[in-house]
């Protein structure tokens, strides 16, 4: 049995998405889901309809790859050992494909985060800076980089780690900071 915190494989997420008739890539789906959860939203069965902005999309069936993706992502974000991981491209993908997947993931994350946090108070100064940095990555493309495999591979891994930690910081900001839900008085 897979660990509840283990993300499904990219290809499995892609295949199930296609079988459901969804025109979304695995990195885009995971980025949107991660943004929604990091911003404090998506705690119900309608998370998929929310991130796809389509009320007609059914919730993933119990035990499905997409339901496991949701459960693993939510568990990773809450893990005290900071286990959160990005679902990007397959291990054998080219550097350009990995970079494209990361930039696509960032664009989707911002959309999901906006869905969750749109009506909440402002983030901390650090949270605002992180969002600006993620927005810059979301606007990037592989054409912006000299794709020297050895040098750029290390740089891409550093950027992936930055994004991973940025998501955890934004999630923490929304849990304990100004965008956390406030009690009504």
Curated annotation (Swiss-Prot):
What are the record's GO terms for cellular component? Answer: cytosol
Quote the InterPro entries the UniProt record gives: YgfB-like (IPR011978), YgfB-like_sf (IPR036255)
Enumerate the SUPFAM superfamilies for this protein: YgfB-like
Q: Name one Pfam family in it.
A: UPF0149
Coiled coil feature spans: none
Regarding protein family, the annotation reads: Belongs to the UPF0149 family.
Q: Which NCBIfam families match?
A: PRK04758.1, ygfB_yecA
Please report the name of this protein according to its UniProt entry: UPF0149 protein XF_2010
Origin organism lineage: Bacteria, Pseudomonadati, Pseudomonadota, Gammaproteobacteria, Lysobacterales
